């Protein structure tokens, strides 16, 4: 049987998607070869790539004045690519700091421009939270404002889209496609694929057309959004198999009823898990309710000495990858789109049994 996988990334993929990929692995649609052996410039592959983009545009309702790029290097490469693409005419940017990933992004950006860091973390009744925008010290003349919509490690998420009068840039790696989003409020959205999109190796960048001519002159051509847009994300050979698999995930999402439908399931999963944690004296979540992530749920045990046993028994119950990030410890359940409600119910049942045995 397939286990329930709570890994933060590379993460669970829908079983139906893996089964389709398995069927097509050796002989893609009767062509006598695997899609991973196919030229990225062949008519067949270009059709697969174009359909994946069209389906993503449909799922996210992406306006026509935005380019959708299928790139490589992970979201971490975008930490450099974004300032190099957007700070050519104005070297100032605001970065909102709420956790480990937004910190990595701002530290990289500091190599390329004059970065104003907004410390937006706070606490409410001892729980971590994000300050109201009225308390941020935003610049008047920034080229853009950057934030990480959902901090994968900390499990802290913005309750609203920031309202700024310059282009808004967001790392959506762990929350893309989990809830409806008004793309028109953003100048640029980026996301590593290996959480809610597909396998590792692919990175999605959605960028508004008017931002394509803002790059620095010393930018490597492979990182230049305008060049990638002009060449259909094929300045060099793209991550063809990851692109194809992501396309299968987009098809699967459309079959589920799209982002609105999957969002309802995600809310149900989060309500079930947080509800159980809050009702327990043994488990604790460190995040204030308004800023709890619906995708990444960190929690601690009342007795830290039981952590190894918890993970061991969870694995015996086919519940995998529940250890928290190495930088923070504790536990973390990542409940992305591909993790079914039954998986979260199985986790809650196990957590309850564990307390009765060891709590």
Swiss-Prot record:
Cytoplasm in keyword set: yes
Reactions it catalyzes: O-phospho-L-serine + 2-oxoglutarate = 3-phosphooxypyruvate + L-glutamate; 4-(phosphooxy)-L-threonine + 2-oxoglutarate = (R)-3-hydroxy-2-oxo-4-phosphooxybutanoate + L-glutamate
Cofactor or coenzyme needed: pyridoxal 5'-phosphate
Residues noted as binding L-glutamate in the record, renumbered to the chain: 41
UniProt keywords, alphabetically: Amino-acid biosynthesis, Aminotransferase, Cytoplasm, Pyridoxal phosphate, Pyridoxine biosynthesis, Serine biosynthesis, Transferase
Cofactor comment: Binds 1 pyridoxal phosphate per subunit.
Name of the molecule in the record: Phosphoserine aminotransferase
Native source organism of the sequence: Acinetobacter baylyi (strain ATCC 33305 / BD413 / ADP1)
């Amino acid at each position: 049987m397939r286990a329930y996988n709570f890994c933060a990334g590379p993460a669970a993929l829908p079983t139906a998607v893996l089964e389709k990929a398995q069927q097509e692995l050796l002989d893609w649609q009767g062509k006598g070869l695997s899609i991973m052996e196919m030229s990225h410039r062949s008519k067949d592959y270009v059709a697969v790539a174009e359909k994946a983009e069209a389906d993503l545009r449909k799922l996210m309702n992406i306006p026509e004045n935005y380019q959708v790029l299928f790139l490589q290097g992970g979201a971490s490469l975008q930490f450099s690519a974004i300032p190099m693409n957007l700070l050519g005419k104005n070297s100032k940017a605001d970065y909102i700091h709420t956790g480990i990933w937004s910190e990595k992004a701002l530290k990289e950006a500091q190599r390329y421009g004059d970065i104003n860091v907004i410390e937006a973390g706070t606490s409410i009744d001892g729980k971590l939270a994000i300050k109201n925008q009225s308390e941020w010290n935003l610049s008047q003349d920034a080229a853009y404002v950057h934030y990480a919509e959902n901090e994968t490690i900390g499990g802290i998420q913005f309750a609203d889209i920031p309202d700024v009068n310059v282009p808004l840039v967001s790392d959506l790696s762990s929350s893309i496609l989990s809830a409806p989003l008004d793309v028109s409020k953003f100048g640029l959205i980026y996301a590593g694929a290996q959480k809610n999109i597909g396998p590792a190796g692919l990175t999605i960048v959605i960028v508004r057309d008017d931002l394509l001519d803002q790059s620095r002159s010393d930018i490597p051509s492979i990182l230049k959004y305008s060049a990638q847009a002009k060449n259909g994300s094929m300045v060099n050979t793209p991550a063809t198999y990851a692109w194809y698999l992501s396309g299968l995930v987009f098809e699967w999402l459309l079959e589920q009823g799209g982002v609105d439908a999957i969002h309802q399931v995600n809310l149900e999963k989060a309500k079930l898990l947080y509800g159980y944690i809050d009702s327990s004296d043994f488990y604790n979540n460190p995040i204030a309710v308004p800023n709890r992530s619906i995708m990444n749920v960190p929690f601690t045990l009342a007795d830290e000495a039981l952590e190894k046993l918890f993970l061991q028994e969870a694995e015996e119950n086919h519940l995998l990858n529940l250890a928290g990030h190495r930088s923070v410890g504790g536990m973390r359940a990542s409940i992305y789109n591909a993790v079914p409600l039954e998986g979260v119910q199985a986790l809650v049942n196990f957590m309850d049994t564990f307390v009765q045995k060891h709590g």
